[in-house]
Amino acid sequence: PNFGKIQKKDKLKIGYMPQSINVINTMPMTVKNFITVRKKYDDISFKQVISEIDIKHLVDKQLSVLSGGEMQRVLLARSLLNNPDLLVLDEPAQNLDISGQLSFYKLIQEIYSKRDISILMVSHDLHLVMVSTKKVLCLSNHICCSGKPQQVAQDPEFISMFGKDMANMMAVYQHTNHTSQIDNHLIDGEIK
């Protein structure tokens, strides 16, 4: 940054989910072994994560037989095992069909709602990003624009990169979780 101050929480735990991994078909590794290898964990945490991600039925399967959607869920579970403060997702819905993408983004929303966690997601799925995030940061060799999805869709730099048609086609809506803000005053979707 050119100005300001960057503050980092002491002992910040980061969970990282890559967009994919190369699985060697001849290497026998179960889902449970993959999730827990090189991770300090307890059985309760493991059981909670596989339940939350809905992969209990996969734990004894070999990685090599998983579908694309199953593998994405396994990668997500692995990134959540140590209860991170920050979850970094690199193209988490890549190679999923549209229903798989919607299901996966819904799961990410549920994780965000249930956990005290920040999520940084890299994605090229503009439509899904614009409807499922609170803040968008648009990069093209520099920060082109950032803000709430509604603001970004109307930003001149966004429009110059993607065109007016794309900005007008964006199905942008704002979802606000009112249940967690009972004691504060909610005005125009923001706590004031």
Question: Which ranges hold each PLM region?
Answer:
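H-loop (His-switch) and adjacent beta-strand-loop-beta switch element
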Residues: 136-148
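Conserved catalytic motifs of ABC-family nucleotide-binding domains
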Residues: 83
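Conserved ABC ATPase signature
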Residues: 62-66, 70
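ABC ATPase nucleotide-binding domains
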Residues: 154, 161-192
